[in-house]
Amino acid sequence: MEVLWMLLVLLVLHLSSLAMSLSTCKAVDMEEVRKRRIEAIRGQILSKLKLDKTPDVDSEKMTVPSEAIFLYNSTLEVIREKATREEEHVGHDQNIQDYYAKQVYRFESITELEDHEFKFKFNASHVRENVGMNSLLHHAELRMYKKQTDKNMDQRMELFWKYQENGTTHSRYLESKYITPVTDDEWMSFDVTKTVNEWLKRAEENEQFGLQPACKCPTPQAKDIDIEGFPALRGDLASLSSKENTKPYLMITSMPAERIDTVTSSRKKRGVGQEYCFGNNGPNCCVKPLYINFRKDLGWKWIHEPKGYEANYCLGNCPYIWSMDTQYSKVLSLYNQNNPGASISPCCVPDVLEPLPIIYYVGRTAKVEQLSNMVVRSCNCS
């Protein structure tokens, strides 16, 4: 009995020490973090350009060809446009949602073949019952099993959303894909996240996709494609006996409703302004500003443009969602015992990185290069 009591005391002390280690962090030396980041960038740039040492040249004394300047500015424009498009398509809360586990659903399609158009009909009410609010939707994919063909011809297929509005049927173009001849059956998929997101806002009982050849020519061979779950276009009914696991279906991943409170709470924290995130004393995992001046910080004269750039870095706490009074504490205790040097909490790491175009000199030759993954735009807990 006394031995059992001693073991219980030791267990309580162990859990207490583990809880303390999870709730406290060492003070961060911001200047040391900055120095390490600068040195890492020095090595990154030289490594990406495959340079053993820095070029011994002063770019300010060189006349840069107009072609190089034009190419550099064009590259900058492309990067900015791409960043703008991605910001529009990906919500600010996407990083938070990506961290949490998703529930996976599979919804089988009711298929119909009409005038060389494959129709995929879904019970939208059933989708709404399972997924819930559109804010919980993470990803939706329309998948179909394409059968092998002996036709040696590429075929471009176009996907449409067929929907009803005010008693009228409308078609909205979504995407097109080139179907190439294959010797084996294979799966084909379309990203329909945006469309399903709209389904969740509507009240229609059924929703439908249509897949049809882009070519309207009368040649039968140009329209010869077989998808499992449909009667073959040649008129036979062989495809009707398709296997259950190869019928067209909609795969959806969504955030379980019980986790939405955590995401909402994180949104509120991230929505209080840049000062909250960019302050060096901010507690959350987010982007910290770091401007690199090539001449001042690295002592380099061989890079002509830009003179410096916003490199940034990630720092801050990540959410720890397990409490010490749950079964997870035992798992974490064992993990910590077997991996004493490893972190048992998520780490704050770069999530979205952008390239950096530069004009630099090797000898008397001006070059324009794009260095990948040099600018940290957002951070995530991983």
Curated annotation (Swiss-Prot):
Post-translational changes noted in the entry: Transforming growth factor beta-1 proprotein: The precursor proprotein is cleaved in the Golgi apparatus to form Transforming growth factor beta-1 (TGF-beta-1) and Latency-associated peptide (LAP) chains, which remain non-covalently linked, rendering TGF-beta-1 inactive.
Source organism superkingdom: Eukaryota
Alphabetical list of Pfam families matching this protein: TGF_beta (PF00019), TGFb_propeptide (PF00688)
Residue span of motif Cell attachment site: 234-236
Glycosylation sites: N73, N123, N166
Stretches the record annotates as Straightjacket domain: 22-65
Gene Ontology biological-process entries: positive regulation of cell division; positive regulation of microglia differentiation; regulation of cell population proliferation; transforming growth factor beta receptor signaling pathway
Keywords per UniProt: Cleavage on pair of basic residues, Disulfide bond, Extracellular matrix, Glycoprotein, Growth factor, Mitogen, Secreted, Signal
Disulfide bond entries: C277-C286, C285-C348, C314-C379, C318-C381
Signal peptide (UniProt feature, chain positions): 1-21
Record has Isomerase as a keyword: no
One function term, GO molecular function aspect: cytokine activity
Region (Bowtie tail): 218-242
GO cellular component, one term: extracellular space
Positions of the UniProt region annotated as Arm domain: 66-263
Transmembrane segments: none
Family: Belongs to the TGF-beta family.
PANTHER family attached to this UniProt entry: TGF-BETA FAMILY, TRANSFORMING GROWTH FACTOR BETA-1 PROPROTEIN
Functional note: Transforming growth factor beta-1 proprotein: Precursor of the Latency-associated peptide (LAP) and Transforming growth factor beta-1 (TGF-beta-1) chains, which constitute the regulatory and active subunit of TGF-beta-1, respectively.
Self-association state and partner proteins as the record states: Latency-associated peptide: Homodimer; disulfide-linked. Latency-associated peptide: Interacts with Transforming growth factor beta-1 (TGF-beta-1) chain; interaction is non-covalent and maintains (TGF-beta-1) in a latent state; each Latency-associated peptide (LAP) monomer interacts with TGF-beta-1 in the other monomer. Transforming growth factor beta-1: Homodimer; disulfide-linked. Transforming growth factor beta-1: Interacts with TGF-beta receptors (tgfbr1 and tgfbr2), leading to signal transduction.
Identification of the protein by name: Transforming growth factor beta-1 proprotein
Origin species: Xenopus laevis (African clawed frog)
